Swiss-Prot record:
Task performed by this protein: Late protein which is part of a large complex required for early virion morphogenesis. This complex participates in the formation of virosomes and the incorporation of virosomal contents into nascent immature virions.
Superkingdom in the source lineage: Viruses
Signal peptide: none
Statement: the UniProt record of this protein carries the keyword Ligase: no
Protein name stated in the entry: 27 kDa core protein
Entry's induction text: Expressed in the late phase of the viral replicative cycle.
Pfam families in alphabetical order: Pox_D3 (PF04580)
InterPro entries, alphabetized: Poxvirus_D3
Species name: Canarypox virus
Length: 267
């Protein structure tokens, strides 16, 4: 998957037979604006969904569209295909406003639909507007944690620290970043399954990650896009490493097992 800074994104976007999916990280509204200007005359309709976390699961909610379905009062490309045949056309939303969303506890999914050779194609933008960082250090088992990627293996730890300002928002932000990390690295992800409820995704789709230039070289971004935080893989490594430390000294082994349990419960 190509990873670029928004500074390197030009003003000419392709609107061809390939469906495209862009993962936007940081304040990247300029990318959305460039896209709209570039293919404005070709867009047949658009819609926006938001993805957030409830009960440790991803949920998606319809936000808006320039078309409204009279039957369901919400819209996506699958509904469009179903009801276009039945009702002839959906209702044009004359509001005319296009909103850029910035809530860090949600991913916002913008789907732009256009026709190419009489086929309907999509350009999907999945935006994580901000990589949150707590105002105070988080202490886990006596250790100061100043790297938010620590929580990618187990975001639930954040919910234990209710003294952190807006800890629920931080928890959701970390949870969503963990899911983005899995998508970027090509790992199985609940986020992919959630996106499939919003837009058609095929193996031939072209993916790209676009990062705001002001955070492109930051530690948070580097770890988000480069490192694997699969919890089971981490547990396997930790188990093997600590097992290799065991010896014939019972006292040493008890210390090793105690530390192992602390680490295992923190992952």
């Amino acid at each position: 998957m190509d990873i670029v800074t928004d500074k390197n994104i030009g003003s000419n976007f392709l609107a061809d037979s390939n469906n495209r999916i862009y993962i936007l990280i940081g304040d990247t509204d300029n990318v959305i604006d460039k896209y709209l200007v570039s293919i404005l005359g070709k867009i047949e309709f658009y819609y926006v969904y938001e993805i957030t976390v409830e009960d440790s699961k991803l949920i998606n909610t319809f936000v808006t569209s320039n078309l409204l379905c009279p039957i369901k009062n919400k819209f996506n490309i699958k509904i469009y295909h179903d009801y276009k045949k039945v009702i002839g056309s959906c209702i044009l939303n004359v509001d005319g406003k296009f909103t850029r969303y910035k809530d860090p506890s949600k991913l916002h999914v913008y789907v732009f639909c256009y026709r190419y050779n009489n086929c309907l194609n999509t350009c999907t933008m999945v935006k994580c507007h901000e990589l949150l960082y707590p105002e105070k250090e988080i202490i886990v088992d006596g250790y100061k944690i100043n790297d938010m990627s620590f929580f990618y293996t187990n975001p639930e730890i954040i919910k234990q620290h209710t003294d952190i300002k807006d800890y629920e928002t931080l928890y959701k932000n970390i949870f969503l970043r963990r899911e983005l990390n899995r998508v970027i690295l090509g790992k199985p992800s609940d986020l992919i399954e959630t996106l499939k409820e919003i837009v058609t995704i095929n193996s031939e789709d072209i993916w790209k990650v676009i990062v705001s230039n002001d955070i492109f070289d930051s530690r948070d971004v580097i770890k988000l896009i480069n490192f694997d935080y699969d919890r089971e893989d981490f547990l396997s490594f930790v188990r093997a490493w600590y097992s290799n430390q065991l010896n014939n000294c019972k006292e040493d082994n008890n210390k090793i097992e105690k530390v192992y349990e602390i680490v295992r419960n923190s992952i």
